[in-house]
Structure formats: structure tokens, C-alpha cells
Amino acid sequence: MLTDGTEERQFLYAEDCCEALETVMECYSDFKPEDPLHITSFNSTSIAEIASHIQGQFNLIGKDEVKIKPGLAKDSVQMDKRNEADTYITGWWTPKTGIADGIAKVFAEMKKDYE
């Protein structure tokens, strides 16, 4: 890893993002320009947790040699700031795919290229 993995982000599965955008378009007249339409998972996940989920996917296919090696660097992009998303949009849309399921789906799709 490039960093120590402690930085957190609010990851969102691509299909959930598409559904959110579709909902905003379909319900466009419900919103005012100043409404906070934050499209996110509303859950912070550390990079180390993401790496662990990916490692778990490799373990499931017998690739136990895939190990997580955290770096020494700290987050130099967001400087460990936590952005809190406004949940206003959840009156119309909520994400359906958790981080573990999303990673499993992406892993399964990408694995097809190597079979």
C-alpha cells in the first residue's frame, strides 16, 4: 500500500451510483438547486479495510500468498479530514450494496479476465 491505510473514504458501488443519478433525474422537480444531493454510501471505510476485503477475495480462490503490506506514509490528499455527507437524498434513494459485497462483485467480474 502507498499509505498506512488508516485514511477513510465513503466508497460507493458503481451500480448504486447509477441508480442514485437515475433517481435524481426522475425526481428532478422534487429538488431545489440548493438541496444537498450527496451521493455516497454514508459509511466511512479505511483503506486498510478495503485491502482486507480484497485479500479475503484472493484467499477464497486459494491465493493465500496475497498479503497486505501497509506503507509508512500518511494520507497526503485529504489530510485525514472526514467529510460528513448530508443524508437528505435518502428520502428518495439509499445505497443497496455494502462494501464487502461490492468488492466481491468487482473481484468476480475482474477474475473472469484471468480464467
Predicted feature residues:
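C-terminal substrate-binding subdomain of Rossmann-fold SDR/epimerase-dehydratase oxidoreductases
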Residues: 1-115
